[in-house]
Structure formats: C-alpha cells, structure tokens
Amino acid sequence: MSMKNPPHPGGVIARQVIEPLGLSVTDAAGILGVTRQALSLLLNERTDLSSGMALRIEKAFGPKMDHLMRMQLAFDLARQRQREGRIRVKRYSGQAKIEEPQPA
C-alpha cells in the first residue's frame, strides 16, 4: 500500500540522522565529502536525493541506500500523482498510424 503523502527523504535524514548526532550541516557535509550547499538543499527538501548522496549517507551514518532511495521513489510517485490532472495525454487505442520519420 502506498502512502498518499510520503515524506521527503531530506527531511527524514535531517531529523533522524543529522540532528540526533548533533552535527551542523557544515560538519555533516564535510563528513560526506559534499558541499554545505548541496547537503543543505537536500535537508531542506529543495532537491531530490541522488543515489550518490544516498550511498555517502549509508557509508557515513548507516541508513541503507536502498531504503533511502525507496523513500525518494515514493515521494516522487506521490508528487506526480498529485500533478497528473495537469498532464494532457490521450489514451492510445491502437488505431492511429504512426508516421516514420523521413530521412533528411
């Protein structure tokens, strides 16, 4: 069963990993080998969690990369479902002829 409003992984990482360790964003960024800005954007939920960052977090702090990436996927899917009304696409019925591109 999927969550309707799953949390952004950045906020979860901030609350459950960085803050309990008493680390500043600058210190955590140094441990992870990333810029303060890159980590701050993630922790403040302004950018998506990349697989590279998830692996760094796993190696430094323990939460499994797979779990973190599943959180990102759940967040992305829920976000797209919320926006689906804005996407205007007609269902393909199998009847339309698809034109082959002509060589230039």
What are these regions (language model features)?
Residues L41, L55, R70:
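DNA-binding alpha-helical recognition surfaces that contact promoter or target DNA
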Residues R46-K59:
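Short, basic-rich loop-to-helix N-cap that marks the start of a DNA-contacting helix
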Residues G33, N44-R46, L73:
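Residue-level detection of the helix-turn-helix DNA-binding "recognition helix"
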Residues M1-L23, R70:
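A short, Lys/Arg-rich alpha-helix, primarily the initiator
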Residues G22-L41:
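Short alpha-helical DNA-recognition segment
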Residues K59-L73:
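K/E-rich alpha-helical interaction surfaces of small helical-bundle regulatory domains
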